[in-house]
Amino acid sequence: MKDPYDVIKRHYVTEKAKTLEGLSLGSGEGKKKGSFCKHPKYTFIVACDATKPLIAQALESIYADKKVKVKSVNTICVKPQPARMFRGKRKGKTAGFKKAVVTFYEGHSIG
């Protein structure tokens, strides 16, 4: 197995990812049905060659002290986007990356 820190590069923090994490934090009382999830979800930037089982093993070994169990892993490959640098004079592309949305079992969380 690869080093877990080579597989999981970093936690992916965006407004959408934080909303997804926040859905599992509330109790859901007095809210519409389906507005909260039972299983916490977190988003990570992972290595481009990482597979779903490898991502699950890496997260379970990194957070072994919290004894988390991964329920499922969904991956998305983000393609490079065109970009302009230096006041629009130079054209280039942003780097492509792979992100993983990881669902933990109920009662398990890394937060």
Swiss-Prot record:
Function: One of the early assembly proteins it binds 23S rRNA. One of the proteins that surrounds the polypeptide exit tunnel on the outside of the ribosome. Forms the main docking site for trigger factor binding to the ribosome.
GO CC annotation: ribonucleoprotein complex; ribosome
Gene3D superfamilies for the chain: 3.30.70.330
Pfam families: Ribosomal_L23
NCBIfam families referenced in this protein's UniProt entry, alphabetically: PRK05738.2-2
Keywords for this protein: Ribonucleoprotein, Ribosomal protein, RNA-binding, rRNA-binding
Family: Belongs to the universal ribosomal protein uL23 family.
Quaternary structure and partners: Part of the 50S ribosomal subunit. Contacts protein L29, and trigger factor when it is bound to the ribosome.
One BP annotation, GO: translation
Tagged with keyword RNA-binding: yes
InterPro entries (UniProt xref): Nucleotide-bd_a/b_plait_sf, Ribosomal_uL23-like, Ribosomal_uL23/eL15/eS24_sf
GO molecular function: rRNA binding; structural constituent of ribosome
Entry keyword annotation includes Ribonucleoprotein: yes
Name used for this protein in its record: Large ribosomal subunit protein uL23
Domain of life, per lineage: Bacteria
Signal peptide interval: none
